[in-house]
């Protein structure tokens, strides 16, 4: 009985499983048929359609990405030009007076919006090629700077101040050219006093810019002003058309104006009265204008910059600053012991 009952249970289980096997078989056949149909349709399609479709998809994705990049870049504000201020220290061998002049310049440069780079050139003794006091002072100013040292020779003290100033400016030009520092270059000294508007207007210069400079002689009680005569052009830009000198004798209470509306010679166009774009230092088209046999033909020379500045002035491409008639003085040079 027990065995019979066990056989009955087995029979019942086999009967309950038997109806499910055809369902599983039908599902497998349906799945295989669908896969076969998809493969058949894929095989009937033209082979060249697949690369074209893939290439079109890649092109669309690239186009969408580029549109996103263009839209983001168009909304990004334009980066202002870098202002490079070169300060030479040839006028004072006294460290205290040199520190006073550098501190005064640093206070003005701290008020200028970035980007700004301050290049300070200083002579150092040959046996000790370092200037720690000046380096510490520059770090405390909070102005982005580079301290350039020039080896001091035995005959440097007997050299004229103008020649020492030119040598230091050549060191700064060589540094700008070697490192491809792109921006507007302004030469200055320890005795220069800047109006903040001048430093802001420098970013509008594309090639050369000029402005009036007032030289104050405290001992002779006299002020001499040199600068460009400017006109407005049809394109609403201010260009130079002449050069003027003005001597004002504070003791006599009068003034004398002479040599107006004339082109300036190279010796008159002092580099402290104009700024230039540094890209001209590595522009080969400008090098070819002057023979290499000429003295100071190198693009790293201040004389080269002066000659190019006079050439731009004669072509009436120099920008006059700061207003339509270039009448505002925004740079004063104090003739003192500094």
Curated annotation (Swiss-Prot):
The keyword Protein biosynthesis does not apply. Glycans are attached at residues 232, 314. Residues 1-21 are annotated as: Disordered. Residues 47-338 are lumenal. The chain crosses the membrane at residues 28-46. Its main location: Golgi. GO terms for molecular function: galactosylgalactosylxylosylprotein 3-beta-glucuronosyltransferase activity; xylosyltransferase activity. Residues 1-27 are cytoplasmic. It is a single-pass type II membrane protein. GO terms for cellular component: Golgi membrane. One of its GO terms (biological process) is plant-type secondary cell wall biogenesis. It comes from the Eukaryota. InterPro entries: Glyco_trans_43, Nucleotide-diphossugar_trans. Belongs to the glycosyltransferase 43 family. Probable beta-1,4-xylosyltransferase involved in xylan biosynthesis in cell walls. This is Probable beta-1,4-xylosyltransferase IRX9. The lineage of its organism: Eukaryota, Viridiplantae, Streptophyta, Embryophyta, Tracheophyta. The gene is IRX9.
């Amino acid at each position: 009985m027990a065995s019979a009952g066990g056989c009955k249970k087995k029979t019942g289980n086999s009967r309950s499983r038997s109806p499910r096997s055809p369902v599983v078989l039908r599902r497998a056949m349906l799945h295989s048929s669908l896969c076969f149909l998809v493969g058949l349709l894929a095989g009937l399609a033209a082979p060249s359609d697949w690369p074209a479709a893939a290439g079109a998809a890649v092109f669309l994705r690239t186009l969408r990405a580029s549109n996103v990049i263009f839209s983001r870049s168009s909304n990004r504000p334009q980066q202002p030009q870098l202002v490079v201020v070169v300060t030479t220290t040839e006028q004072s061998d006294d460290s205290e007076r040199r520190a006073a002049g550098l501190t005064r310049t640093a206070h003005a440069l701290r008020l200028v919006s970035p980007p700004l780079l301050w290049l300070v050139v200083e002579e150092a003794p040959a046996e000790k090629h370092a200037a720690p006091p000046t380096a510490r002072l520059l770090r405390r100013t909070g102005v982005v700077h580079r301290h350039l040292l020039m080896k001091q020779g035995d005959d440097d003290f007997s050299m004229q101040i103008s020649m020492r100033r030119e040598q230091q400016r050549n060191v700064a030009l060589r540094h700008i050219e070697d490192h491809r520092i792109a921006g507007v270059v302004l030469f200055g000294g320890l005795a220069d006093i800047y109006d903040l508007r001048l430093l802001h207007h420098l970013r509008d210069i594309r090639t050369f810019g000029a402005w009036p400079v007032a030289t104050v002689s405290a001992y002779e009680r006299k002020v001499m002003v040199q600068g460009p005569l400017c006109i407005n052009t049809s394109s609403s830009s201010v260009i130079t058309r002449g050069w003027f000198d003005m001597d004002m004798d504070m003791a006599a209470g009068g003034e004398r104006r002479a040599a107006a509306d004339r082109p300036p010679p190279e010796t008159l166009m002092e580099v402290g009265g104009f700024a230039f774009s540094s890209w001209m230092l590595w522009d080969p088209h400008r090098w070819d204008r002057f023979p290499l046999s000429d003295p100071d033909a190198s693009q790293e020379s201040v004389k080269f910059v002066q000659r190019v500045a006079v050439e731009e002035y004669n072509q009436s491409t120099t920008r006059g600053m700061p207003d339509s008639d270039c009448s505002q003085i925004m740079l004063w040079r104090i003739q003192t012991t500094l």
